[in-house]
Amino acid sequence: MPKKEIKSIKSHVSCPRNFKKRNLQDMKHKNIGATESKILSAFIKKSRNWFTVSDAYSLFPELSENAISIQLARMTYDGLLMHICKGTYYMIPYEQDSETFMPDWHLLAEPLVGGEHYIGYYSALQIHQLITQPSLNEQIVINKRIKPSEKAIKGVKFQFIYHNPKHFFGYKKTWIDSFNKVLCSDLEKTIIDCLYKPDYAGGIVEVAKAICMSKDKIKYEQLLNYAVKFDSQAVVKRLGYLLELLSIPTSIIDELQKLRSNSIIVLDTELPKQGKILSRWNIQQNVDIETIKNAILT
């Protein structure tokens, strides 16, 4: 299909929230196949920017899934669609070059997983505007294991991090721009997750910075409830330690003290197990206090 013939349709997919505001009738006057027109129109009307072969097949029960797959492959070749993963396609905005187009990768979490998930760890810190260095690594928390656990799409690594049912909670639809929402851990759960696995959050220094930056937004009772529900000594001890180190006045510190056990955990999982033991929190301080404080001040 010539590029000029698909211009009208591709203009509809530049922004999912604007799909319904566009006039779909002009597609009838373009030299576009009936199947292509029906597929794109259906998902534009639903404000969908991605779909599966099965979704498309439901529009044409008289055709085989193989025939639909061939049609979608042709549309991909024509620059209408981007192939995300097996059986899943993303609609490409007209103004974008199909060879280089890459949507905001937060939007690819749902089509890649196709089930329950949320964006977490360092990626969630980015959505909550708590980091200054964006990463080409999207971290997606899942409650069912996916193999392989990583997938690369046009230079962006998507990492699927498994959480057991006990740890899979505390997420909601969150705005990432003026038009789109994604499932992301809320602020308090983001902090809990990052304390559990600091290596997925850029290290304990990044976690400390995030807590300091959001200290006036954090719901501390919610944070405590999450820590209790998560039921991890590493979370309890790192959280209590950092709240005291950052001089954040909150009564949950006393509650965290009551929850701590006698076992020793390291402050930062990315660094060697060395440094003095802080008996108040039973933490091995393998990161210098000044390193944390200086990072917060810069």
Predicted regions and their residues:
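Short gly/ser-rich loop at a beta-strand->alpha-helix junction or flexible surface loop bordering the NTP-binding
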Residues: 83-95, 101-167, 283
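Hydrophobic alpha-helical interaction segments
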Residues: 2, 172-298
